[in-house]
């Protein structure tokens, strides 16, 4: 904590001092006439109220000053400034009329002692000076606000211009009006519920049909635009796919070469196998007589076995 | 009246006992007094502590002590079941009274066997003779009983209940002004608090309960079917000065030694102020010795002026034992996608210029804030600035498998020391990559590198991404399938597609790193997967649909939101806990955070524009007249100060379902249903989410019909609900028709995902506008609407969202807080167009994203004032709504989007409000 708020102590001290002074004033005023005392109290009360209101207006002015002096882009609170301006304007006008009324009261009491009149006039002049200073401050703040608004507008325009300059308007340019008209093929909705609201008027039927035709034309254009967008994205994806394919093909060159060599080996091996099979076939053909003999023996044995049983 | 009845009943018991002459039943007449004494105990304590005079305080304390002892004696007798007597005669009252006195005196010999009476006996003068002590005890117990009864009477008079008024939902148009009305009042007398300050209980903008009257048993809560939850919004403004709360600066923090609840306005001081009784668990705690001493000024201070005893929402400045390390500085790491799409759409240029404009608005009072910039495409581009240097050095890391930091220092830039270098870097950031043709996006490796950069400190990673990550870890595929939209399998598109983002979120949360996502879409962006990081690291997800900087509306919206985001005074390394009174337990937590243990929510950084929902379970029967909930959030401010924000809300208890329904808050219930349905949509299916909303509403209507509605024997049974819940069906219907939950084949998964993100994080006033947008009529608004008065800019009255109110020649404004729509009917007269927009015909108005022109015309000035007022209604939001112009004869898709906000009308898949009520009526009848 870099500082300590001792406002409460100060206010307590002020309260004590004020009460002490009030006691002294009461003692002095014992001998005065009641009417004069009452009149002075009324005057002092009104003056004090006006002074308090001027102070409150000053506080609002301070807050307005803070808001108006903000120069950072996007740090603008126009509604808050507008509201504060309205309140301050109202306060200033009401204070002005209050001070005028107070001045009338002072003029109406010309028969008072000269010293008291001088004091009253001094109080009125002092209040008028405070109000004038507050009004001047208000005017200065409004001027600053106007300048800052112009500067902020210029900077905003520069900001937008630089952003636009950097951006490619073609990207995301279509279908900006509705977030639901993207990614998909938009199917034109009939919207009977909404269109039928106006069909009660017979006079509007013709215009409604024309509007519907116009909508259909717009829908057709939007459809074509969406299709083109889809084709564009598909082509982009295909480009990526082909790039990956080329990369895979280059990576697999050695593998393909080895496969080719293995294929040649396979061909020669198959040739050798074929020659062996041909030899075996010839040997099997020459042994045909032996097969017949074995087959005959088996049949004879079978017949004997059957006769015995 | 109730007290007299109780007294009379007691008399009847006494009479019967006298007649029967049965000694064991001699204790029955004392039974009814026990409850009253127990209920009024807090009064005795409060009164005792409220008095400053020592003499009177001692006397009151003695009465309180005596009041406790008889309660214990009677408590032991309470175990016997009460015996009911049906016969009584009025002429027996006087003898019964005498008998009661005899009984009380007869009970006196029992105390020596109990510990509490011994405590009481110890306080009597030891020099007194024993018979005198006995007589004194008897006398004081009698006075305690009578005192308790009188206090009970005062309590009954001081605790009015909310009136239960039934309305027939069919016979009236929904009163949408209820959405902005205050919730049902919490009828808790201020005498329960230590100081009686009007700010002792929590205002609804911070903590809002679904029921402002808590049932004493879980069975009553279950029978009522009303969910019990708290909606907590610890901050209501982006910067502290817009909504300051009292700060306790002397680091004297007193907490209950058992339940650890902080001292609060409802703590009960006893023992002449030296001790206090915890309002949560009832245990007695010591007050710190220095509690009444102002060590800075060396004077005695008034205890009752301490902020934590007068305000329900306070900030404590934490002492040393609440810190585990030096306070963390504010750190932002900007992960900027510099792929071809980002450069072409203008995102990189707009972002760098917006950050440049925001450097003065980042909170940096102590000069400790740090920033870092990492460009992401097929490689990682780091930028190094030495302190005092005027130029930045770019360091490119091409290794994406194991991304490393190319330099040990000067990558994390102190905002004040490296200011010139940062400014030069941001000015040339766009031109550095203007000629890129690289379409890669290595977001995963970039996140890993950023995490490695700040994992020892903590901070925020701000991702600005325009394309789908397609390189390295965490790359995502194009899985959007239009054929799945509107079917049951659509829910799979809302689930995360890659486990990297969940596991990385856990790593970030552990090292106090928070991730925010700003997503700009050219095509599919997979918001469902990328929003996992913000969800578990207490960040946020922003989505800019088909964004292009050449449209000034897009550029200004993003720049405004980014600067608001950077100027927010976030809290760092925060943990939040919600504690409740005995018998209450927090069961579920909803929002963007990481649940570290069962009831501790961890926030690497705490944003000021979100809210959280906590569900409450009643575990034990509540015996006190009120319960308290305390939300404590220990955090480090962005200015390096360790603080604890404490929000305390106390709610009265009841055992009446009528009181329960009369105190229900429809807005809080709607918010609870919203966040629960959002979680269901993300964890299971959209159908279950929609069904959970409708089924809860049907349950509430069933209970109301069976238990609370008037006995209606007519043939036509009305659909009734209490006045304070009459908008709940409309809010549930609007919720099921919302972008996040509506059954439709035209809502892409990205739009649905971002809608669910908003639904689960928006604070209550903004969420209500998001669910049920506000409709204003501008062509015939009152003369004072749009003008500035003492109360600020006057808004016109809100209309119901039904297109029956729309005229074909009118001008209307719909505000959802995220978007604003101006609808101009096709039959608008040229004078209206000239006054409002400065154009002569409808053909001159360009539909779509729109900037309201500023011309010197009263109607235009008023409309601009209304638009500005709506944008600044809530100081706790970073969102700047997009304005769209919809023409009555314009684009059908834009019009269907506009009319989809009219939730009281029938649409393709949803019923109208009256049809919805008919459906509810049929379900309730079953």
Curated annotation (Swiss-Prot), chain A:
An annotated GO cellular component? Golgi membrane
What keywords appear on the UniProt entry? Answer: Coiled coil, Golgi apparatus, Membrane, Protein transport, Transmembrane, Transmembrane helix, Transport
Q: Indicate yes or no for the key word Lyase.
A: no
State the Gene Ontology BP annotations: endoplasmic reticulum to Golgi vesicle-mediated transport; intracellular protein transport; vesicle docking; vesicle fusion
Query: One Pfam family, short name please?
Result: Syntaxin-5_N
Q: t-SNARE coiled-coil homology domain: from which residue to which, for each copy?
A: 218-280
Q: Which residue ranges traverse the bilayer?
A: 289-308
Q: Which residues lie on this side of the membrane: Vesicular?
A: 309
Per the database entry, which stretches of residues form a coiled coil? 37-66
Q: Which InterPro entries match?
A: SNARE, Syntaxin, Syntaxin-5_N, T_SNARE_dom
For membrane topology, the record states: Single-pass type IV membrane protein
Major localization listed first in the record, in broad terms: membrane
- Give the SMART domains listed for this entry: t_SNARE
Where in or outside the cell it occurs: the entry states: Membrane; Golgi apparatus membrane
Which Gene3D superfamilies does the UniProt entry name for this protein?
1.20.58.70
Q: List the disulfide bonds.
A: none
Q: Which CDD domains does UniProt cross-reference here? A: SNARE_syntaxin5 (cd15844)
Please verify whether the record's keywords include Coiled coil. Answer: yes
Q: For side Cytoplasmic, which residue ranges?
A: 1-288
| Family note | Belongs to the syntaxin family.
Q: What does this protein do?
A: Required for vesicular transport between the endoplasmic reticulum and the Golgi complex. Acts as a target organelle soluble NSF attachment protein receptor (t-SNARE).
Per its record, how is this protein called by name? Integral membrane protein sed5
UniProtKB/Swiss-Prot annotation, chain B:
Query: Where is the protein situated, by its record's location annotation?
Result: Cytoplasm; Cytoplasmic vesicle, COPII-coated vesicle membrane; Endoplasmic reticulum membrane; Golgi apparatus membrane
Q: Which CDD domains does the UniProt entry name for this protein?
A: Sec24-like (cd01479)
Cited Pfam families:
Gelsolin, Sec23_BS, Sec23_helical, Sec23_trunk, zf-Sec23_Sec24
Q: Which residues of this UniProt protein bind Zn(2+)? A: 256, 259, 278, 281
Which controlled-vocabulary keywords does the entry list? Cytoplasm, Cytoplasmic vesicle, Endoplasmic reticulum, ER-Golgi transport, Golgi apparatus, Membrane, Metal-binding, Protein transport, Transport, Zinc
The record ties this protein, via InterPro entries, to: ADF-H/Gelsolin-like_dom_sf, Gelsolin-like_dom, Gelsolin-like_dom_sf, Sec23/24_helical_dom, Sec23/24_helical_dom_sf, Sec23/24_trunk_dom, Sec23_24_beta_S, SEC23_SEC24_subfamily
Q: Which residues cross the membrane?
A: none
Positions of the region Disordered?
A: 1-21, 73-93, 107-134
This entry carries the following GO cellular component terms, namely:
cis-Golgi network; COPII vesicle coat; cytosol; endoplasmic reticulum exit site; endoplasmic reticulum membrane; equatorial cell cortex; Golgi membrane
Similarity section: Belongs to the SEC23/SEC24 family. SEC24 subfamily.
This one is known as: Protein transport protein sec24
Q: Which gene encodes it?
A: sec24
